[in-house]
């Protein structure tokens, strides 16, 4: 049971922070299907920086890891500007823009990974190999049966994500910026009439989404494979979008959806081990979160609390 909780959290929390990014963007009124590409590009930037500076630190130093997280967030937010440019400046279809960003990220990072490995590191590889992240166990509280597993063998990024998620919740629901952002997704003309720049608020929301997606991407790179490669694009971004939809674009219910996906995945892996199934069944287990997504769509698709102006191109002159 403990291993299911430990592994489930290490999958659910990066997914959760990516979903929060999607909530920020869609609450502002901009459809965000580019989470997959943003997390991949952010992970690419973070992994490259981590490998480039690793030689300046001892093998067990956590500094490259934390710098990688920062740079992944920066990389994701910068790459998100493409989506912002297409949607806000050129008023492109937001769904198509998201798909384009995803495809561009996949192709660009695959090419640049090989190029940088050859030019910078003198290697013929299609991946950046990362160091294995250390884990943290919180003394005392980790001894509590079942609940203690939440505080056992934590990746450092799990604590970072919890802190960032709390800040994101506070900003969204307890600040004027969050109020204006939510209003942009429901009635952008009212926001404009109040003297606020709808375009600037939506730009900020898109960049926040990019930063949080990039953070989630580098966390997946460290926890799942300890490297960056094209295998980072396996649908985690779309799973984050599904989670925020099931959470009705609210942060706390979205956390519940992410935990459900995480525990379904880790529980499936544990089941394979307990039943001593062939290792090939582990690949089958990877589809459990997506099967769960389809089932939830069947039962909860009618409970849609999306922002009223989501996906609607804002025209200041139209009323």
Put a short name on every predicted segment:
Residues 26-45, 88-101, 180, 224-238, ...:
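Short, non-helical or kinked segments that cap or interrupt transmembrane helices
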Residues 18-19, 43-49, 106-110, 158-171, ...:
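Hydrophobic core segments of alpha-helical transmembrane domains in multi-pass membrane transport
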Residues 59-106, 265:
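Alpha-helical transmembrane segments within multi-pass membrane transporters and channels
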Residues 151-228, 256:
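Helix-loop-helix "hairpin" substructures at the membrane interface of multi-pass membrane proteins
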Residues 105-173, 275-285, 312-319:
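Transmembrane helix-bundle core of multi-pass membrane transporters
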Residues 186-193, 197-200, 271-319:
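Cytosolic-side transmembrane-helix boundaries in multi-pass membrane proteins
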Residues 213, 223-290:
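Transmembrane alpha-helical segments in multi-pass inner-membrane proteins
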Residues 1-19, 31, 45, 56-67:
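Membrane-interfacial amphipathic/re-entrant helices at transmembrane-helix boundaries
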């Amino acid at each position: 049971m403990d291993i299911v909780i430990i592994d489930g959290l290490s999958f659910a929390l990066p997914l959760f922070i990516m979903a929060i990014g999607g909530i920020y963007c869609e609450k502002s009124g901009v459809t965000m299907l580019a989470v997959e590409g943003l997390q991949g590009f952010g992970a690419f930037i973070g992994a490259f920086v981590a490998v480039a500076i690793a030689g300046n630190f001892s093998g067990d130093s956590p500094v490259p890891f934390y710098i990688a997280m920062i740079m992944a967030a920066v990389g994701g937010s910068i790459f998100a500007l493409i989506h912002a440019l297409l949607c806000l400046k050129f008023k492109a279809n937001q769904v198509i823009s998201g798909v384009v960003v995803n495809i561009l990220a996949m192709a660009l990072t695959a090419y640049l990974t090989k190029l940088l490995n050859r030019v910078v590191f003198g290697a013929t590889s299609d991946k950046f190999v990362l160091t294995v992240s250390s884990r943290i166990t919180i003394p005392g509280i980790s001894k509590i049966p079942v609940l203690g597993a939440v505080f056992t063998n934590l990746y450092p990024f799990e604590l970072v994500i919890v802190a960032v998620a709390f800040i994101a919740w506070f900003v969204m629901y307890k600040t004027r910026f969050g109020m204006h952002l939510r209003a942009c997704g429901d009635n952008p003309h009212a926001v404009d009439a109040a003297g606020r720049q709808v375009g600037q608020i939506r730009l900020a929301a898109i960049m926040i989404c990019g930063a949080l997606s990039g953070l989630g991407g580098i966390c997946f790179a460290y926890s799942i494979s300890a490297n960056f490669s094209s295998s980072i694009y396996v649908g985690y971004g779309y799973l984050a979008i599904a989670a925020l939809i099931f959470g009705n674009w609210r942060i706390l219910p979205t956390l519940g959806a992410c935990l459900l996906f995480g525990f379904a995945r880790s529980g499936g892996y544990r089941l394979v081990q307990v039943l001593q199934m062939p290792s090939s069944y582990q690949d089958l287990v990877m589809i459990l979160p997506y099967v769960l997504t389809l089932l939830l769509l069947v039962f909860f698709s009618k409970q849609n609390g999306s922002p009223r102006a989501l996906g609607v191109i804002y025209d200041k002159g139209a009323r």
